[in-house]
Amino acid sequence: MREIDQRIDQYSESDLPDFCRKPTLVLGIGNILFGDDGFGCEVVDYVEAHYPVPEAVCLLDAGTGVRKLLFTLCLSTARPQRLLILDAIDAGRSPGEIFELDPAEIPPVKLDDFSMHQLPTSNLLRELQETCGVEVRVLACQTGPLPEEISQGLSKAVSGAVPQAAEWLVRNYFSCTAAPQADLCPSA
């Protein structure tokens, strides 16, 4: 671990990726090849197509590669102040319902997602929040039944929730109080 810390310390802040240096990081995650699981990625695409993204926000479609990004954040010398995860979750609600979660509230069925390295992504989110001081939230959408085989595209209910989630994101993370930007904030 000390060797990793030494390698990270030799980088200047300008060498770090944007997602480490911006005050707010928004990650859309999921697998677009498994129906509603692609919700987070679709929200990122929708926001990029319909809204200007403030300079203080890094908006990424992380797909199924979220684990590597979270490891990088945990080990980095610079981190965002806030991290929002956009994800599809089965929490027993109505399909297409949008709701907010703290990392500690992630349903047990999600704890083993992307478990290639046997360390659940939710543990990394808690580590970022509790040890690294990053404010972490999850904006989730209740999925319909996920396909057992490859099936690209969201269900009607979840597809209808994409603009609603995008509006929530813009209102809560692109606003003047969340990330002051000259192009979004009126002059005082």
Task: Give, region by region, the residue ranges found by the protein language model.
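N-terminal catalytic or cofactor-binding beta/alpha core of small enzyme domains
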Residues: M1-V134, V138-T143, Q152-Q164, V170-A188
